[in-house]
């Protein structure tokens, strides 16, 4: 077993070069950094737009995980607005659990390039779940 936070052990996080930066308990905001691999580049040498959804979804999942004391999330929908091209290199995503309910959580995130420029925004709705194999609760 490793001492890494669970969200950094997920295969998708490893693929995107994820690093956990911080979690603010007061605002339920998780900050993660990613280093997309060269294979994420489009023909212009920038990160392909659709692939930016991955780090944003990953950070939103981390925000839900931390805001709900360890629940997993299944993304039901995600809306991504691309504001500017993202060069290959380190990116930072700040994701906030806006409202957590017993089953549904609303999340928002912002993605910044290595220069601190806001490059994308996303909102998502997710369903919180227990870890696979967990025994169902009384209301399952």
Label each PLM-derived region with a short phrase.
Residues 1-140:
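Terminal targeting signals and extreme-terminal segments of soluble enzymes
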């Amino acid at each position: 077993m490793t001492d890494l936070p669970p969200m950094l052990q997920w295969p998708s996080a490893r693929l995107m070069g994820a690093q956990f930066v911080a979690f603010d308990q007061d605002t339920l905001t998780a900050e993660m950094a990613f280093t997309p691999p060269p294979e994420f580049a489009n023909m212009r040498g920038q990160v392909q737009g659709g692939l930016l959804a991955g780090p944003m979804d990953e950070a939103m999942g981390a925000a839900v995980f931390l805001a709900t004391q360890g629940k997993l999330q299944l993304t039901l929908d995600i809306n991504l607005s691309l504001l500017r091209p993202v060069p290959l290199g380190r990116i930072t995503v700040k994701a906030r659990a806006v409202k957590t309910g017993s089953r549904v959580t609303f999340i928002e995130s912002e993605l910044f390039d290595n220069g601190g420029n806001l490059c994308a925004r996303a909102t998502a709705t997710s369903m919180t779940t227990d870890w696979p194999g967990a025994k169902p609760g009384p209301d399952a």
